[in-house]
């Protein structure tokens, strides 16, 4: 099954940017939760986890790494688990796949670690700017 996972940080976000994708999916899951919440603690993250454990998902599409979370450790743990489960994770905004044609992508681990760290740093900057603005 080909699944797209989206996450919006707040209830006020429309998600239009995420729905402009015209790719056909078997299932689209949308969590409206902060990226600091662990992937497996999110309602749709839990649904996705069950489907993966049942062997029903072969491809997981995300718009960008930050949709999986803003905590580097949690994102990497989630990606490693998905890899163990042989799920090909595809990140649309950079066109990167974890397992193209079922074979591990050698550059995947490095790129996913760097990108996850950058998104965590971005979250810290947002928090800092929010505190200064109060």
Task: Give the residues covered by each predicted segment.
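Short, structured surface patches at the beginning of a domain
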Residues: 1-133
């Amino acid at each position: 099954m080909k699944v797209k996972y989206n996450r919006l940080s707040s209830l006020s976000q429309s998600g239009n940017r995420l729905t402009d994708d015209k790719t056909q999916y078997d299932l689209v899951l949308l969590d409206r939760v902060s990226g600091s919440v662990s992937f497996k603690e999110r309602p749709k993250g839990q649904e996705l986890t069950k489907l993966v454990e049942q062997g029903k998902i072969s491809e997981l599409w995300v718009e960008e790494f930050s949709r999986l979370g803003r905590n580097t450790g949690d994102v990497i743990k989630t990606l490693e688990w998905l890899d163990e489960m042989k799920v090909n994770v595809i990140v649309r905004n950079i066109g990167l796949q974890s397992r193209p044609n079922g074979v591990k992508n050698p550059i995947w681990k490095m790129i996913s670690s760097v990108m996850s760290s950058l998104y965590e740093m971005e979250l810290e900057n947002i928090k800092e700017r929010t505190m200064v603005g109060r």
